[in-house]
Amino acid sequence: MIDKESLKKCLKLYLVTDSEMLKGRDFYKCLEDAISSGITTVQLREKNASGREFLRKAMKLREITKRYGVKFIINDRVDIALICDADGVHVGQSDIDVREVRKLIGNNKILGVSARTLEEAICAKNDGADYLGVGSIFTTSTKLDAKSASFETVKEIKEKVDMPFVLIGGINLDNIDKLKCLESDGYAIISAILKAEDISKEVEKWTLKI
């Protein structure tokens, strides 16, 4: 079983990958720069990658994250998570059934689920999720069709669903202070870190801010 308190610490600064944000820069170097500077969990999420490319990136990132003692989560692809022995899987509401994922990965791997409403959060917990990705909190360029989750909804989820959660969606250093009142366990970041010219310095700024 996954220890809830240990998991909360791992969720503090959660980086979701998107190689298109890097504009041609070396994917592995950028990710290692981020990981070595304070990222606590990495989720491999490459929606436009072929299966072969996704697997290649997963195997290499598994090596890097292990070296730094950082948790490694695979988005959607349970098969690849098992092949590369990732720490866990994250699925959305329209992806594979959460209960089926839990059966496939067992009880010793982390299972994260996206949730926008209290109902989705409750279902995710009942179906075997270990943590929630709650959002989109703000408008985001990485998921244009993402519907927002209100602050009131987040507060309800925290109060009524006793499980770790990260906030996701359009979060940056200029608006993060607005989120402190929501008392999440961490923040899932994409563009605010990956678009930075100096990723190491950007991650260091985040570690000081949160």
From Swiss-Prot:
Keyword Magnesium assigned: yes
InterPro entries from the UniProt entry: Aldolase_TIM, ThiamineP_synth_sf, ThiamineP_synth_TenI, TMP_synthase
Entries under SUPFAM superfamilies matching the protein: Thiamin phosphate synthase (SSF51391)
UniProt binding sites for 2-[(2R,5Z)-2-carboxy-4-methylthiazol-5(2H)-ylidene]ethyl phosphate: 140-142, 170, 190-191
The protein's annotated pathway: Cofactor biosynthesis; thiamine diphosphate biosynthesis; thiamine phosphate from 4-amino-2-methyl-5-diphosphomethylpyrimidine and 4-methyl-5-(2-phosphoethyl)-thiazole: step 1/1
Residues that bind Mg(2+): 76, 95
EC nos: 2.5.1.3
Transmembrane segments: none
Gene3D superfamilies assigned to the protein according to its UniProt record, in alphabetical order: Aldolase class I
Sample GO molecular function, one term: thiamine-phosphate diphosphorylase activity
Catalytic reaction equation(s): 2-[(2R,5Z)-2-carboxy-4-methylthiazol-5(2H)-ylidene]ethyl phosphate + 4-amino-2-methyl-5-(diphosphooxymethyl)pyrimidine + 2 H(+) = thiamine phosphate + CO2 + diphosphate; 2-(2-carboxy-4-methylthiazol-5-yl)ethyl phosphate + 4-amino-2-methyl-5-(diphosphooxymethyl)pyrimidine + 2 H(+) = thiamine phosphate + CO2 + diphosphate; 4-methyl-5-(2-phosphooxyethyl)-thiazole + 4-amino-2-methyl-5-(diphosphooxymethyl)pyrimidine + H(+) = thiamine phosphate + diphosphate
Domain of life, source organism: Bacteria
Keywords tagged on the record: Magnesium, Metal-binding, Thiamine biosynthesis, Transferase
Any one GO cellular component localisation term in the record: cytoplasm
Cofactor(s) in the UniProt record: Mg(2+)
Positions bound to 4-amino-2-methyl-5-(diphosphooxymethyl)pyrimidine: 43-47, 75, 114, 143
GO BP terms: thiamine biosynthetic process; thiamine diphosphate biosynthetic process
Coiled coil: none
UniProt remark on cofactor binding: Binds 1 Mg(2+) ion per subunit.
EC supergroup of this enzyme: transferase
Family stated for the protein in its record: Belongs to the thiamine-phosphate synthase family.
Function of the molecule: Condenses 4-methyl-5-(beta-hydroxyethyl)thiazole monophosphate (THZ-P) and 2-methyl-4-amino-5-hydroxymethyl pyrimidine pyrophosphate (HMP-PP) to form thiamine monophosphate (TMP).
Protein's recorded name: Thiamine-phosphate synthase
Source organism phylogeny: Bacteria, Bacillati, Bacillota, Clostridia, Peptostreptococcales
